[in-house]
Amino acid sequence: LETWLIVAIVVAFLVWRMMPAKGVQSISAAQLKNILHDKDKVFIDVRTPAEYKGRNIPQFKNIPLGSNFNHLPKDKEIVVICQSGMRSSRACKQLKKQGFERVTNVRGGMSAY
């Protein structure tokens, strides 16, 4: 019984961690292709510089997770990508906490692109 309780708590925690942050929009890689040339959006890739150098989307600027996002314009939508969607989800939460209103995560990241 005690083991099942621990397992349930761990599963609940993992599900909670994967949930999108409040107010963060989520789009697919296919939807991303339709907005790549929108000048009212800022595209950031939060992977490491080595990952970015290996393969990237030209419209995305490399700003690794953990960097300071304060220099980004708060009046534009920020579209965030990583390799799988996990780091970009964390970056989106960080951006929302810093007061960015329009934040969008690319589901599945570069793996889905």
Locate the predicted segments by residue.
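Short, composition-biased local secondary-structure segments
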Residues: 2, 61-68, 72
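Short loop/helix-cap segments at secondary-structure boundaries that form the rim of catalytic
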Residues: 52-58, 70-73
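Short active-site oxyanion
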Residues: 37-43, 58-59, 76-77
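Flexible, polar/low-complexity N-terminal or interdomain linker segments that lie immediately upstream
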Residues: 1-42, 46-53
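Conserved beta-strand scaffold positions in the cores of enzyme catalytic domains, especially
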Residues: 43, 60-62, 103-105
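Residues at the C-termini of beta-strands that transition into short coil/loop
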Residues: 30, 47, 64-66, 107
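Catalytic cysteine-centered active loop of the rhodanese-like fold, especially the PTP/DSP P-loop
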Residues: 67-113
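Glycine-rich, phosphate-binding/catalytic loops in enzymes
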Residues: 59-62, 96-98
